[in-house]
């Protein structure tokens, strides 16, 4: 493979980043490369030995990440940032992640073993019915509180009033009703209550 960009230059003077950029530009937008394939192409172009490539690999990977012209597309696939608009970058990465999610099988839950219960058939295993261990736990809709439902607030106020009436002294002889309009306490009220 010959890269016209480097015509007339010594291959030994080229950096791996420069060669990687040229290789990706030559391949084009829809031909992203896996990291290992990119390294193999660079090695073939530069004609370096396996030991030299292995020695330069950590620095090359670091430069690939820090150089602003490359972008990781997930799955260790690399492309040029100039190929993608800002919105497309997120779409490409999300599409790759969705493909990965389809391939991953759900993990099986590990069963806990209690060493003290092995020989005892009469023992009760309290871990067997723990509702927090269930993945498909659904809340009871009757127990949920809806901010939008005015009946919930009305029920709360009625329950609160009933509790206050239970606590009120019996010598009052009547239910205590709270008047929300009398929230302010004036000085005149203070004098009459002291007398």
From Swiss-Prot:
Bias class Acidic residues marks the residues at 120-138, 145-195
A single Gene Ontology CC annotation of this entry is: DNA-directed RNA polymerase complex
Q: Superkingdom, according to UniProt?
A: Bacteria
Q: Where is the HTH HARE-type domain?
A: 14-83
Question: Gene3D superfamilies from the xrefs?
Answer: RNA polymerase, subunit delta, N-terminal domain (1.10.10.1250)
Return one GO MF term. Answer: DNA-directed RNA polymerase activity
Q: Which InterPro entries match?
A: Asxl_HARE-HTH, RNAP_delta_N_dom_sf, RpoE
**Region (Disordered) residue spans:** 120-195
PROSITE patterns according to UniProt: HTH_HARE (PS51913)
Keywords on record: DNA-directed RNA polymerase, Nucleotidyltransferase, Transcription, Transferase
Pfam families in alphabetical order: HARE-HTH
Share an example GO biological-process annotation for this protein.
regulation of DNA-templated transcription
Record's family? Belongs to the RpoE family.
Q: How does it assemble?
A: RNAP is composed of a core of 2 alpha, a beta and a beta' subunits. The core is associated with a delta subunit and one of several sigma factors.
User: What NCBIfam families has UniProt attached to this entry?
Assistant: RNAP_delt_lowGC
Function of the molecule: Participates in both the initiation and recycling phases of transcription. In the presence of the delta subunit, RNAP displays an increased specificity of transcription, a decreased affinity for nucleic acids, and an increased efficiency of RNA synthesis because of enhanced recycling.
HAMAP family per record = RNApol_bact_RpoE (MF_00357)
Q: What is this protein called?
A: Probable DNA-directed RNA polymerase subunit delta
Gene encoding the protein? rpoE
């Amino acid at each position: 493979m010959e890269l016209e960009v480097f015509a007339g230059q010594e291959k030994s003077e080229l950096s791996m980043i420069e060669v990687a950029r040229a290789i990706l530009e030559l391949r084009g937008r829809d031909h992203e490369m896996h990291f290992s394939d990119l390294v193999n192409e660079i090695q073939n172009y530069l004609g370096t030995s396996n030991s030299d490539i292995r020695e330069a690999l950590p620095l090359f990977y670091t430069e690939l990440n820090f150089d602003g012209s490359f972008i990781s597309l997930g799955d260790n696939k690399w492309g040029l940032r100039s190929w993608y608009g800002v919105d497309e970058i997120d779409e490409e990465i999300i599409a790759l992640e969705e493909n990965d999610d389809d391939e991953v099988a759900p993990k099986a839950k590990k069963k806990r073993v209690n060493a003290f219960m092995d020989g005892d058939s009469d023992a009760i295993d309290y871990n067997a019915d723990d509702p927090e261990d269930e993945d498909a736990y659904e809340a009871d809709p009757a127990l949920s509180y809806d901010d939008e439902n005015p009946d919930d607030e009305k029920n709360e106020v009625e329950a609160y009033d009933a509790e206050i009436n239970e606590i009120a002294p019996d010598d009052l002889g009547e239910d205590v009703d709270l008047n929300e309009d009398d929230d302010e306490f004036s000085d005149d009220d203070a004098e009459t209550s002291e007398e």
